[in-house]
C-alpha cells in the first residue's frame, strides 16, 4: 500500500471516529470477555454440529478484527486475541434493528471489538460464533499491513514491534517462549537452593566485565554514575556476607556496537555458589540446558539454523590452547609461544597492541580462527590470566585460570570460573587493569576499593557464571538475530529519514 493510499484510509477512519464521538465515548471500557479463542477451539472443535446445537454454548470474546467478509445480510469476521483467532458469523437479523448496516458495516479491520454469541459449525465444519451482540471497544486509525504481504520489512518489524506482534504469529510465539524460558531458569535455580537477589543498576564504579560503560550524572549526589555492565562484584559481596547461593536475572548495559549477537541493553542470568568449582558449574549448566530443551520442546533434541543439537549428551570440552591447534592444523605449540604468537596474529590481520601479552594475543587468535567453528555445545577452558582479571589462577599453571566459556552454534553463550578470592592478588590485577585503561584501553576495569575491602573479610571458595538470556532464547527459538528475541531492540533514530 502506498503512503498516499495509507494516508487516505487514516483520514477516512478519523472521520468515522469523529462521528462516533458525537454519539458518545467510542472507547468502551465495560466489556468483560469470558473466553479465549484458543480455549474455545481446544474444547469444542471436535464436537459435531448436532452436539454444539444441543449444548447451546454461550461465549464472549474480545479481540482485534483481522478479516472481514461482508456478503449482503451476513458477514464473517476473524477476531484475534492473545491466544489465537476464531471466526464470528454475523447476520443482520440477529442484531438490533439498523445496527448491521449503520454500525457493523462501518467497522474496519484492526478495530478491537467485544462479541457475544453461541458456538456452531459452518457448512464446511469450521467452529464459529453466531453473534448476538458486538461492540466496538477501540477504533483503529491506522490500517494494518495487507494480509498476504504482511509486515515483511525487517527494520519496520523491529521499530514497530506492536504491528509485528499483531501480524506475525511466529513473533508472538517467540516472546511467549522467551517468557517460558526465563520462568524455567528462575524455577531451576530456586529448586537448587539459590536465592534471587537484586543489585544496583546504577553504580559508582562499573565492574564485573571488560566492557565500555554508559555514564550518567546523579544530580542530588552531584557525582558521575554508570549503568552496570555486570552485577558480578555485588553478587560476590553477598557471598562474602554469607549468602552461599545467589542469582540475579539482570539488565546490563554496554556502550558497544550493534550486531546480530549484540545489543547495548541485554539480559543475563548470573549465579554464584560458595564451595563450588568451575567444574561444578559446567555440570550444572549442562543440566540447565537439558531441562530448558525438555521444557520447551519435550525433548533434548533441538534444531538451530541448520544444525541439530542433542542436549542429552555431555558437552565437548577443550582448552583455549588446544582448540587453536585443533582448528589450525598448520600451527604447532611452538607457533603460540611468546616469540611467534605475535607474528601469527599479524598474519591473520590482527592489529597487536604494544601492551598485549601472550595471553591476549592467543585469545585474539582463538576468536579469529576458532570461535565460529564451535557449533556443537563446547566448553572452552583454561583462559589466560591476562584476560581473566576476576578468575582464580590454575594451581599448576599460573598463566591460565580455572575458567570456561560455553559456545553453541559458533557463539558464546556462557562464561564462568572459579572466583579469585585472594584480596591481595585481586588488588594487583585491578592495578594492572588501571594501567591498561591509562594506556587507552577503554574496556579495562577500574580499581574497586570497596570490593577489595569485602574480599579482605574473606570470601569462601566460590564459582560463578553468567549466561546471556537473549542468546539463549535465540538458540531455543531458532532465531538468527538477537533483534528477533528483543521486543524493542535499539535502532538508529528515525528523525531525518
UniProtKB/Swiss-Prot annotation:
Coiled coil: none annotated. Binds 3 Mg(2+) ions per subunit. It catalyses: tRNA(Lys) + L-lysine + ATP = L-lysyl-tRNA(Lys) + AMP + diphosphate. The keyword Repeat does not apply. Its cofactor is Mg(2+). It is an enzyme of class 6 (ligase). GO terms for cellular component: cytosol. Pfam families: tRNA-synt_2, tRNA_anti-codon. GO terms for molecular function: ATP binding; lysine-tRNA ligase activity; magnesium ion binding; tRNA binding. Its EC number is 6.1.1.6. It is found in: Cytoplasm. It comes from the Bacteria. Homodimer. HAMAP family: Lys_tRNA_synth_class2 (MF_00252). This is Lysine--tRNA ligase. It comes from Ruthia magnifica subsp. Calyptogena magnifica.
Amino acid at each position: 500500500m502506498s503512503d498516499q493510499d495509507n494516508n487516505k484510509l487514516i483520514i477516512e477512519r478519523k472521520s468515522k471516529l469523529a462521528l462516533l464521538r458525537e454519539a458518545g465515548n467510542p472507547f468502551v471500557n465495560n466489556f468483560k470477555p469470558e473466553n479465549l479463542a484458543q480455549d474455545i477451539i481446544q474444547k469444542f472443535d471436535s464436537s459435531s454440529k448436532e452436539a454444539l446445537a444441543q449444548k447451546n454454548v454461550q461465549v464472549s470474546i474480545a479481540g482485534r478484527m483481522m478479516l472481514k467478509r461482508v456478503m449482503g445480510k451476513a458477514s464473517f469476521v476473524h477476531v484475534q486475541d492473545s491466544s489465537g483467532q476464531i471466526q464470528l458469523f454475523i447476520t443482520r437479523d440477529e442484531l438490533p434493528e439498523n445496527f448491521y448496516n449503520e454500525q457493523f458495516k462501518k467497522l474496519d479491520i484492526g478495530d478491537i471489538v467485544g462479541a457475544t454469541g453461541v458456538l456452531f459449525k459452518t457448512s464446511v465444519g469450521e467452529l464459529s460464533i453466531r453473534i448476538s451482540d458486538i461492540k466496538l471497544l477501540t477504533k483503529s486509525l491506522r490500517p494494518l499491513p495487507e494480509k498476504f504481504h504482511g509486515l515483511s520489512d525487517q527494520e519496520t518489524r523491529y521499530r514497530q514491534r506492536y504491528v509485528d506482534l499483531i501480524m506475525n504469529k511466529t513473533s508472538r510465539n517467540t516472546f511467549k517462549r522467551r517468557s517460558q524460558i526465563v520462568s524455567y531458569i528462575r524455577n531451576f535455580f530456586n529448586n537448587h537452593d539459590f536465592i534471587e537477589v537484586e543489585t544496583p543498576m546504577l553504580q559508582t564504579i562499573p565492574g564485573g566485565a571488560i566492557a565500555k560503560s554508559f555514564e550518567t550524572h546523579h544530580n542530588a549526589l552531584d557525582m558521575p554514575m554508570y549503568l552496570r555492565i555486570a552485577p558480578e562484584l555485588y553478587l560476590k559481596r553477598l557471598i562474602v556476607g554469607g549468602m552461599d547461593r545467589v542469582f540475579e536475572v539482570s539488565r546490563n548495559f554496554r556502550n558497544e556496537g550493534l550486531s546480530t549477537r549484540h545489543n547495548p541493553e541485554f539480559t543475563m542470568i548470573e549465579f554464584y555458589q560458595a564451595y563450588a568449582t568451575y567444574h561444578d558449574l559446567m555440570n550444572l549448566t549442562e543440566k540447565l540446558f537439558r531441562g530448558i530443551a525438555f521444557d520447551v520442546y519435550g525433548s533434548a533434541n533441538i534444531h538451530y539454523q541448520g544444525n541439530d543439537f542433542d542436549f542429552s549428551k555431555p558437552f565437548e570440552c577443550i582448552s583455549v590452547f588446544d582448540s587453536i591447534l585443533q582448528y589450525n592444523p598448520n600451527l604447532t605449540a611452538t607457533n603460540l609461544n611468546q616469540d611467534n604468537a605475535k607474528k601469527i596474529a599479524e598474519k591473520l590481520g590482527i592489529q597487536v597492541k604494544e601492551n598485549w601479552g601472550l595471553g591476549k594475543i592467543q585469545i585474539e587468535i582463538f576468536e579469529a580462527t576458532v570461535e565460529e567453528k564451535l557449533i556443537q555445545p563446547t566448553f572452552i577452558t583454561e583462559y589466560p590470566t591476562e584476560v581473566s582479571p576476576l578468575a582464580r589462577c590454575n594451581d599448576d599453571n599460573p598463566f591460565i585460570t580455572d575458567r570456561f566459556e560455553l559456545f553453541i552454534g559458533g557463539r558464546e553463550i556462557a562464561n564462568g570460573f572459579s572466583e579469585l578470592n585472594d584480596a591481595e592478588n585481586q588488588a594487583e590485577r585491578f592495578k594492572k587493569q588501571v594501567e591498561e585503561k591509562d594506556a587507552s584501553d577503554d574496556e579495562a576495569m577500574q580499581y574497586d576499593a570497596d570490593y577489595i575491602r569485602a574480599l579482605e573479610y574473606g570470601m569462601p571458595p566460590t564459582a560463578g557464571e553468567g549466561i546471556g538470556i537473549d542468546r539463549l532464547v535465540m538458540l531455543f527459538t531458532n532465531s538468527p538475530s538477537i533483534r528477533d528475541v528483543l521486543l524493542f531492540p535499539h535502532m538508529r533514530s528515525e528523525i531525518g529519514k
